[in-house]
A protein has these predicted regions:
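Structural core segment of the AMP-binding/adenylate-forming
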Residues: 47-48, 75-114
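Conserved donor sugar-nucleotide recognition element shared by glycan-biosynthetic enzymes
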Residues: 5
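A generic, residue-level signal for flexible/boundary positions that often mark functional hotspots
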Residues: 16, 23, 77-81
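Aromatic/hydrophobic pocket-lining residues that form π-stacking "cages" and hydrophobic walls in ligand
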Residues: 9, 68-69, 114
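Flexible acidic/glycine-rich loop/turn elements at helix↔coil and beta-strand↔loop transitions
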Residues: 11-17
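Conserved AMP-binding/adenylate-forming core of the ANL superfamily
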Residues: 2, 18-63, 67-71, 88-93
């Protein structure tokens, strides 16, 4: 039984292992690959000091990296703060400050806005 959404990739990898989990722009990922990427990303966030209850802003366009980041944040028990990529820089600033984000994950094309 799963206790939170951060456990979904590991449970799916256990059940479906090398079956296709995600296809994005011609690239295919197995359930094992997604879980491994989530583990690595969660480890990186943990190394940065992110712990359960911290808020992490996710500011990125739709991509496989967004999915991995989403589950990595959840895996740590941190709060996911997804931000609409259509917001203006001042709106993004407000959202990030208002939620008390400890970290921001942004795609390269969005970094300039923050």
């Amino acid at each position: 039984m799963l206790n939170h959404i951060g456990q979904i990739p590991a449970a799916a990898a256990f059940k479906f292992s090398n079956k296709d989990a995600l296809v994005f722009e011609g690239r295919t990922f197995s359930f094992n690959e997604i879980n491994d990427l989530v583990e690595r990303a969660a480890g990186g966030l943990s190394d940065l000091g992110i712990v359960q209850g911290d808020t992490v802003t996710l500011y990125a366009a739709n991509s496989w990296e967004w999915i991995v980041s989403y589950y990595a944040i959840a895996r740590l028990g941190a709060v996911i703060n997804p931000v609409n990529t259509m917001l203006t820089p001042s709106e993004i600033e407000y959202v990030v400050k208002d939620c008390g984000a400890k970290a921001i994950i942004a795609s390269p094309e969005k970094v300039a806005a923050i």
